[in-house]
Amino acid sequence: MGHIFANLELSNPRKPELRSLGVNALADTDALMLCLPEHIALQLDLQTESLREVTVADGSSMNVPYVGPVKVSFENRICFVGALVMGDEVLLGTVPMEDMDLLLSPSRQSIVVNPSSPNIPHARVKKSMGSDSIDFDRISIESDPIDLH
């Protein structure tokens, strides 16, 4: 399939006075998180919230800073995520891609907004037990509590 890149805009929502950064991010479907090189985290003045132990493709583990929040913008979509500070390029993992309802288009070698929901990102929310979707229009105070754990 080759490498697929996306032009993103990254910003620090805690510091709106800072300019956003335009970056070319590699879509990495093997990664869950947004990963940022250290110089990007410094430019955005992102606060380290904690350390995270990560396992990389070669099987080795390391502790890396977890920073955030980061506002990620792609076309008409935005999301707010934490990011791992590691590597030498921006990696767009599956969590922010799903949050913004983006799809990989191998034939176009690009990331695209889901054509089934072009104006508003779609999210599927399910009960943790069973496969029934939650109908939020039918939930009332008298409804059974939903166990999200």
Indicate where each model-derived feature is located.
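Pepsin/retropepsin-fold aspartyl endopeptidases
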Residues: 1-141, 146-149
